[in-house]
Amino acid sequence: MAGLRGLLVDLTPLRRSRDFRLLWGSQVFTSLGRQVTVVALPFQVYVVTHSSLAVGLIGLAQLLPLLATGLYAGAIADRVERRLVQLAGKSTAFLAAAALAAGAGLHFGVWWFYLWAACGSAGATLDQTARAATFPRLVSRGQYPAAAAMNQMLFQGAAVIGPSLAGLVIASAGSAPAFAVEAVCVIPSALLVLLVSRQSPAHDAARIGWRAPVDGVRFVLGRRLLVGIFAADLIAMILGLPLAVFPALALSVFRLGPTGLGLLYAAPGAGAVVASLLSGWVSRIERQGTAVIVAIVIWGAAIAAFGVLGDVLPIGLLLLALAGAADVFSAIFRNSILQLSIPDAMRGRMSAFNLIVVTGGPRLGDLEAGLAAYLVNPVFSVVSGGLGCVAGILLLAGLLPELRRQRAGVQDQATPSSSTAKTSVALGGIGPTPRDP
């Protein structure tokens, strides 16, 4: 039994910290609602346009406000009471979800969905940045890996339940009620945030200004290890993420209907849930940099294999589940490496930078996948993306030995990657951000 407990996810942060329980519970509702929209939005756009490229352009619509607000949202989270920043983001997300529901019910054109997808992205950026900057305050340093694993388990659980629920709701009632689910979920999420203890800004936080985003960029660019961590995630998401072609595969190629579409979106989350539940061993892995590389190779190979064998639905779902498991282990190890790199005064800015990578990468991945499907076909988009991911991460591993050599508990010493290292800060901290839609 002791050996089995060592494999299962560590629930200590949930037991010991009231505020962690509240914020974690708030995120349950937020993630569930967003994951329903993750299916409903591309479904609606594909039904209106019958174009994978149009679906991919959702990613571009979401990326622009993410970039525009991301780093400044981090600076705000470093200077303003973080619960208020979260509530501002949740209010914006509520309006966006309600507008999407109205647009689907009234059969508005595709421009309406691009517009409110952008607004929802801005709201999610505010919410997620402040939340990610708050989590590390709520647990002890020794519980950071367990807290990161629990956050991943939460998101991936929502990534199974949300898409499955979306498929059922869309099949029975259409996409408008599916969008309404997110609006409803925002309400208890906001109430739980209000119950969290006041989260005052750090005393040494930088003043909000136009140079605030530059501080975060310099902090990353001054450390080759951090450059490698963020580049690895971008390679996996931009090249290997096939979500934008799922509507075409499910509705036009495999003929699975809305319920089958929900299964495709849910399968990676199912694999990730199993991986999260069996994540108790991750703290014992010494060579965490190598673990990131191996996990991303498995992710890319599984995605490419799905493109070849996905017409056999059970095999396709298993391959997507394997990819999801690899992704969650990659995220856990990347976040563990980040723990010793971020001071509390910069957590907001660095959480925003991390957020831009882990959510901006998938948006670019949507655009890449949709464009490849438009130029060739959806199957080519999936296979070429997976193989490109494998090649890209192996190339990165060769170019950045710091990533390969990184070991657990070894603090990054700010190995210069450019002249910006002269202005970098060398302090310890954490800024893990679970991947969100």
List PLM regions with ranges:
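Alpha-helical transmembrane-bundle signature of multi-pass membrane transport and export proteins
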Residues: 1-436
